Amino acid sequence: MNNKKTFHEVSEIWCDAKRPIVKHSTLCAYQLTLQTHLLPRFGAAENITEKDVQQFVIDKCTSGLARKTVRDIVAVLKSVIKYGNKHGIFHFEEWEIEYPTQTENKLPPTLSLNHQRILMRHLLEQPTPQNIGVLLALCTGMRIGEVCALKWEDVDFAQKTIIVKHTVDRIYNCELKSTERVYSSPKTKNSDREIPISKQLLQALKMVRKQSQSPYVVGTSTQSKEPRSYRDYFGRLLKRLDIPHLVFHGLRHTFATRCIESQCDYKTVSVILGHSNVATTLNLYVHPNLNQKKRCIDRMSNFLGIT
């Protein structure tokens, strides 16, 4: 390679190539990953070996980062280097990277059934422009960015459905060195979806619609709610109701968990959540307990018909 460049130089060219292709929020995420994790380690490198990447992975995992987070970082690293290799400015050979096994498989944080009932009773008794977003997340599994970006025009009262087609988030722009609010399409193509509205949620939405002057379902402003400030509101609400702390995304986990517990089929739950595939839903929410395993074995034994 006559025109060899450093990883830092290649990453800048790669970002420029990605700019017209990916969402602005995605590009900002790439740049933040590069700035925070990759450039400090590999910025000056003109060659990155499998051994280098393997040690990087071990260091990141042992520092406390989740294995999925480290995989995502390595995916950006690989994409930059492969781009450099394609254009003859950086050498690349395929890696076989091993990731340290996780010692425990943590279940997603959820509300207990009792705490969910307490919260839902409060939300249904007081359907306000502030409370409705929490109820939306509990009854549909929508992400906080989708909840805050939801407009009344996306709620079909006649068909009793919600169309999820936007999300809002405040992201860090590495070029501006400041945060900015970004509206965009949802996380993946599967995230653009239609969700049926339950009877309880429909009634609450109608009551909020009567008093709302905002184009957005959540809040009273002409602009959407900031996800960060809405998380703070949710935290205060839980404290007021004497419910243990839960991150807002735990409402999505709670919705999915209750769907699985009530024996909804996995494919339908996956589509409602906007997951890219059923495997994501299964890995996150389907964790059979011992009694369920015993019933499975008993059914199989009975099916054989051998006494």
Residue ranges and their predicted role:
Residues L32, P196-P244:
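Active-site/catalytic core of tyrosine-dependent DNA strand-transfer enzymes
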